[in-house]
């Protein structure tokens, strides 16, 4: 059974917990979240598995155990099994709809699964992909500012004092920095939630990372190949010279596009029309001083 295989896989990680009862609670909770329960909180899980409620609550919310050694072991295992110098680190957010309001970080925020703002928790995840396979290697729970500032909420859910508000970009950079030291990789990729913010791109630059990031079509860019000369000494191109990516694309000549063979599909070769140019970006009232490749 899949559950038995998962328990076997998880055993070395539970073994890192300092006490026997912690290992047992961990195994029970893992089993509980894989059930068909509508509400997969502590109470329904304890009832379904016939476990005492309070010990399981204490294990999840108050007991002082460090999850970092488990993630470190997972990362080492991934390196052994999937590591490749051409590997890719994948940053991806995911939201989890919640019916209640007591779980840590629950707030009315964008939920991609529902396609709208709703009551949910948001996690930032880091995956690893190589030609040998793919898996998740790290995660961070996004704590909204309203939670980070609330002493009452923090105390009720036992949020550690060291945890402060950080943007999703800051959380992602932290994971890339920590796991990138262990996992061999050539690229970092992410969707437009991370491709748009200037600070995320700048953070990757500072770490010396190569990256491929999705950006929104309304991001302002300056095509350096078409930049007009600017007389006199200036601090850089004026804001008025920048245009949205979609407008820049619409103004290209047919000769600017190149047919690119992506892969062979079941119905024959998959080809796209693509183009690229060096640009500077302008977003969040900030102009990037570094030029980057824009690929469309």
Feature roles, as predicted:
Residues 153-232:
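Domain-level cores of phosphate- or acyl-group-handling catalytic modules
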Residues 18-22, 28, 32-101, 200, ...:
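Electropositive nucleic-acid engagement tracts
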């Amino acid at each position: 059974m899949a559950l038995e295989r998962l328990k076997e896989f998880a055993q070395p990680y539970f073994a890192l917990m300092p006490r026997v009862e912690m290992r047992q609670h961990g195994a029970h909770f893992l089993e509980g979240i894989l059930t068909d329960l509508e509400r997969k909180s502590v109470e329904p899980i304890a009832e379904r598995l016939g476990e005492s409620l309070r010990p399981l609550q204490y294990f999840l919310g108050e007991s002082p155990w460090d999850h970092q050694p488990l993630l470190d072991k997972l990362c080492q295992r991934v390196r052994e099994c999937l590591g490749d110098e051409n590997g890719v680190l994948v940053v991806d957010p995911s939201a989890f709809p919640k019916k209640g309001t007591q779980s840590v970080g629950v707030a009315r925020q964008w939920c991609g699964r529902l396609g709208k703002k709703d009551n949910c928790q948001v996690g930032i995840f880091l995956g690893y992909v190589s030609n040998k396979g793919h898996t998740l290697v790290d995660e961070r729970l996004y704590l909204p500012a309203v939670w980070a500032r609330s002493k009452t909420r923090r105390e009720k859910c036992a949020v550690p004092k060291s945890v402060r508000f950080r943007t999703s970009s800051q959380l992602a950079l932290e994971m890339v920095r920590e796991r990138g030291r262990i996992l061999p990789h050539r690229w970092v990729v992410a969707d437009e939630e991370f491709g748009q913010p200037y600070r995320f791109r700048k953070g990757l630059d500072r770490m010396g990372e190569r990256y491929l990031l999705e950006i929104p079509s309304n991001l302002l860019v300056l095509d350096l190949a078409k930049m007009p000369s600017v007389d006199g000494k200036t601090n850089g191109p004026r804001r008025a010279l920048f245009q949205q990516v979609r407008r820049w694309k619409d103004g290209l000549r047919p000769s600017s596009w190149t047919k690119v063979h992506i892969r062979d599909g079941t119905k024959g070769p998959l080809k796209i029309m693509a183009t690229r140019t060096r640009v500077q970006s302008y977003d969040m009232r900030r102009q990037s001083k570094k030029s980057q490749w824009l690929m469309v």
